Protein backbone atom coordinates (compact mmCIF):
# COMPACT_ATOMS: atom_id res chain seq x y z
CA UNK A 1 0.00 0.00 0.00
CA UNK A 2 1.14 3.54 -0.69
CA UNK A 3 2.26 5.59 2.31
CA UNK A 4 4.97 8.26 2.61
CA UNK A 5 8.36 7.06 3.86
CA UNK A 6 8.87 10.17 6.00
CA UNK A 7 6.81 13.27 6.69
CA UNK A 8 7.85 16.57 8.18
CA UNK A 9 4.70 16.76 10.33
CA UNK A 10 2.76 13.72 11.52
CA UNK A 11 -0.64 15.43 11.61
CA UNK A 12 -2.31 17.86 9.20
CA UNK A 13 -5.40 20.03 9.17
CA UNK A 14 -8.25 18.49 7.22
CA UNK A 15 -8.86 21.57 5.06
CA UNK A 16 -11.99 22.48 3.17
CA UNK A 17 -13.36 20.16 0.47
CA UNK A 18 -12.00 20.91 -2.99
CA UNK A 19 -12.99 24.04 -4.77
CA UNK A 20 -12.30 24.22 -8.49
CA UNK A 21 -10.49 22.07 -10.98
CA UNK A 22 -7.14 20.27 -10.73
CA UNK A 23 -4.20 22.57 -11.47
CA UNK A 24 -1.83 19.87 -12.69
CA UNK A 25 -1.91 16.22 -13.67
CA UNK A 26 -4.63 16.76 -16.27
CA UNK A 27 -2.82 15.22 -19.24
CA UNK A 28 -1.77 11.66 -19.99
CA UNK A 29 2.03 11.63 -19.75
CA UNK A 30 3.06 7.97 -19.54
CA UNK A 31 0.47 5.61 -21.03
CA UNK A 32 -2.07 5.60 -23.85
CA UNK A 33 -5.26 5.61 -21.77
CA UNK A 34 -6.21 7.26 -18.50
CA UNK A 35 -8.87 7.39 -15.80
CA UNK A 36 -9.95 10.95 -15.01
CA UNK A 37 -11.71 12.11 -11.84
CA UNK A 38 -14.95 14.04 -12.41
CA UNK A 39 -15.61 14.93 -8.75
CA UNK A 40 -13.50 16.20 -5.83
CA UNK A 41 -12.69 13.58 -3.19
CA UNK A 42 -10.23 12.05 -0.79
CA UNK A 43 -9.01 8.73 -2.22
CA UNK A 44 -7.56 6.45 0.47
CA UNK A 45 -4.46 4.31 0.01
CA UNK A 46 -6.66 1.19 0.26
CA UNK A 47 -8.92 2.40 -2.57
CA UNK A 48 -5.90 3.15 -4.78
CA UNK A 49 -4.51 -0.33 -4.10
CA UNK A 50 -7.87 -2.02 -4.76
CA UNK A 51 -8.19 -0.18 -8.10
CA UNK A 52 -4.62 -1.11 -9.05
CA UNK A 53 -5.23 -4.80 -8.30
CA UNK A 54 -8.50 -4.78 -10.29
CA UNK A 55 -6.70 -3.32 -13.32
CA UNK A 56 -3.63 -5.56 -13.20
CA UNK A 57 -5.75 -8.70 -12.79
CA UNK A 58 -7.74 -7.80 -15.89
CA UNK A 59 -4.79 -6.96 -18.16
CA UNK A 60 -2.83 -10.12 -17.08
CA UNK A 61 0.78 -9.01 -17.71
CA UNK A 62 -0.31 -7.44 -20.99
CA UNK A 63 0.40 -3.82 -20.26
CA UNK A 64 1.79 -1.36 -17.75
CA UNK A 65 -0.14 0.60 -15.12
CA UNK A 66 0.94 3.98 -13.74
CA UNK A 67 -0.59 5.41 -10.56
CA UNK A 68 -0.60 9.19 -10.90
CA UNK A 69 -1.90 10.07 -7.41
CA UNK A 70 -0.13 9.55 -4.09
CA UNK A 71 -1.73 9.52 -0.62
CA UNK A 72 0.31 12.12 1.26
CA UNK A 73 -2.33 13.54 3.65
CA UNK A 74 -2.68 11.82 7.05
CA UNK A 75 -6.20 11.45 8.46
CA UNK A 76 -6.39 11.13 12.23
CA UNK A 77 -9.05 9.40 14.30
CA UNK A 78 -9.69 9.06 18.01
CA UNK A 79 -10.57 5.66 19.49
CA UNK A 80 -14.24 4.75 19.89
CA UNK A 81 -15.99 5.90 23.10
CA UNK A 82 -13.22 8.34 24.03
CA UNK A 83 -14.05 11.56 25.84
CA UNK A 84 -13.50 14.85 24.05
CA UNK A 85 -10.23 16.67 24.54
CA UNK A 86 -6.78 15.24 25.26
CA UNK A 87 -5.42 16.23 21.86
CA UNK A 88 -5.82 15.21 18.27
CA UNK A 89 -6.08 11.50 17.46
CA UNK A 90 -3.37 9.34 15.94
CA UNK A 91 -2.96 9.07 12.15
CA UNK A 92 -5.16 6.18 11.00
CA UNK A 93 -4.83 6.22 7.21
CA UNK A 94 -3.56 8.30 4.29
CA UNK A 95 -5.49 9.99 1.49
CA UNK A 96 -4.74 11.62 -1.85
CA UNK A 97 -6.67 14.85 -2.41
CA UNK A 98 -8.17 14.59 -5.91
CA UNK A 99 -9.89 17.40 -7.79
CA UNK A 100 -11.97 17.17 -10.98
CA UNK A 101 -9.86 16.80 -14.12
CA UNK A 102 -7.06 14.86 -12.43
CA UNK A 103 -5.71 11.77 -14.23
CA UNK A 104 -5.50 9.10 -11.52
CA UNK A 105 -4.33 6.02 -13.44
CA UNK A 106 -2.66 5.45 -16.81
CA UNK A 107 -2.41 2.30 -18.88
CA UNK A 108 -0.36 1.26 -21.93
CA UNK A 109 0.44 -1.86 -23.93
CA UNK A 110 -3.13 -3.16 -24.32
CA UNK A 111 -5.98 -2.67 -26.78
CA UNK A 112 -8.58 0.02 -26.19
CA UNK A 113 -11.37 -2.38 -25.23
CA UNK A 114 -9.15 -4.16 -22.67
CA UNK A 115 -8.07 -0.77 -21.28
CA UNK A 116 -11.68 0.43 -21.14
CA UNK A 117 -12.77 -2.67 -19.20
CA UNK A 118 -9.76 -2.47 -16.84
CA UNK A 119 -10.54 1.19 -16.09
CA UNK A 120 -14.22 0.34 -15.56
CA UNK A 121 -13.27 -2.33 -13.01
CA UNK A 122 -10.93 0.14 -11.29
CA UNK A 123 -13.59 2.87 -11.21
CA UNK A 124 -15.92 0.56 -9.26
CA UNK A 125 -13.34 0.56 -6.45
CA UNK A 126 -13.29 4.37 -6.25
CA UNK A 127 -15.80 6.61 -4.44
CA UNK A 128 -16.18 9.13 -7.31
CA UNK A 129 -17.43 9.39 -10.87
CA UNK A 130 -14.67 8.88 -13.41
CA UNK A 131 -14.13 9.07 -17.15
CA UNK A 132 -12.02 7.01 -19.57
CA UNK A 133 -9.74 9.24 -21.67
CA UNK A 134 -7.28 8.59 -24.50
CA UNK A 135 -3.88 10.20 -24.95
CA UNK A 136 -4.73 12.61 -27.78
CA UNK A 137 -7.89 14.07 -26.28
CA UNK A 138 -7.80 16.54 -23.43
CA UNK A 139 -10.91 15.45 -21.53
CA UNK A 140 -13.58 17.89 -20.48
CA UNK A 141 -14.91 17.23 -17.00
CA UNK A 142 -18.50 18.27 -17.71
CA UNK A 143 -18.93 15.46 -20.26
CA UNK A 144 -20.44 12.35 -18.68
From Swiss-Prot:
GO biological process, one term: translation
SUPFAM superfamilies (alphabetical): Ribosomal protein L16p/L10e
Region of interest (Disordered), ranges: 1-23
Alphabetical list of PROSITE patterns matching this protein: RIBOSOMAL_L16_1, RIBOSOMAL_L16_2
InterPro entries to which the protein is assigned, alphabetical: Ribosomal_uL16, Ribosomal_uL16_bact-type, Ribosomal_uL16_CS, Ribosomal_uL16_dom, Ribosomal_uL16_sf
Biased composition (Basic residues): 1-16
UniProt keyword rRNA processing present: no
GO molecular function, one term: tRNA binding
Swiss-Prot/TrEMBL keywords: Ribonucleoprotein, Ribosomal protein, RNA-binding, rRNA-binding, tRNA-binding
One Gene Ontology term, aspect cellular component: cytosolic large ribosomal subunit
Gene3D superfamilies documented for this protein: Ribosomal protein L10e/L16
Function: Binds 23S rRNA and is also seen to make contacts with the A and possibly P site tRNAs.
Record note on quaternary structure: Part of the 50S ribosomal subunit.
The name this protein goes by in its record: Large ribosomal subunit protein uL16
Amino acid sequence: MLIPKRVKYRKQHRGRPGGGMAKGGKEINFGEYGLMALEPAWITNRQIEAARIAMTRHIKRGGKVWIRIFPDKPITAKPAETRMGSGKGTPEYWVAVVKPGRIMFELAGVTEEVAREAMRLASHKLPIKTKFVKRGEVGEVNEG
